[in-house]
């Protein structure tokens, strides 16, 4: 869920969704850095009771002090570090300060396939998950998919079907069936690059 960022309204939304889908579906709350500590704690306790699977980005990522406090008060796993400063070395500080239960990254934000793999391995060394954020466009989604299938500590492939300007770069986009995506079997990224699009949109060539 990406709710509105107002604590009481977000709690009501979380309740309504849980009632709507029942208890079998895993639900997660992404508050998108919306709260101060008190509201973050209030929402966290509410979604714990609703059996939400994790609690993402309740506070701004500069507020490590209150993340530590929040993690001490709540049982629901906290996930943060999507845009945390310091990237690889900064993430190590989040782990050693016990400020989050799971790391977050993707090929675009983290800096590519290799840095994202390093981040996953860093989390793995502490027996933690590194859940990979959606890529935002077709090419990034495919690159994320490769990393997810190469590491043992990412449970979900977060995928928003691309539309409009974000659907580019591939002859055919990722297809999923009943919530599942199959691994590509072709070389490289495993999907055919749309070179015709690249030629049509070509502006200049750097020598």
Predicted regions and their residues:
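Catalytic core of soluble alpha/beta enzymes
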Residues: 1-140
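Flexible C-terminal active-site loop/helix
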Residues: 114, 119, 135-207
């Amino acid at each position: 869920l990406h709710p509105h960022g107002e604590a009481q309204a977000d709690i009501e939304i979380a309740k309504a969704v849980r009632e709507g889908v029942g208890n079998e579906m895993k639900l997660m709350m992404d508050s998108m850095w919306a709260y101060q500590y008190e509201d973050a704690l209030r929402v966290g306790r509410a979604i714990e009771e609703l059996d939400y699977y994790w609690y993402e980005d309740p506070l701004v990522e500069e507020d490590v002090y209150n993340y530590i406090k929040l993690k001490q008060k709540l049982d629901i796993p906290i996930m943060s570090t999507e845009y945390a400063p310091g990237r690889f070395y900064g993430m190590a500080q989040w782990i050693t300060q016990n400020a989050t239960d799971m790391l977050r990254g993707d090929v675009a934000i983290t800096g590519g396939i290799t840095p994202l793999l390093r981040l996953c391995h860093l989390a793995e060394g502490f027996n933690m998950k590194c859940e990979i954020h959606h890529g935002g466009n077709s090419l990034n989604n495919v690159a994320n998919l490769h990393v997810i299938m190469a590491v043992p500590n990412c449970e979900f492939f977060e995928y928003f079907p691309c539309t409009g300007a974000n659907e580019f770069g591939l002859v055919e986009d990722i297809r999923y069936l009943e919530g599942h995506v199959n691994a590509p079997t072709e070389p490289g990224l495993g999907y055919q690059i749309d070179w015709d699009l690249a030629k049509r949109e070509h502006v200049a060539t750097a020598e």
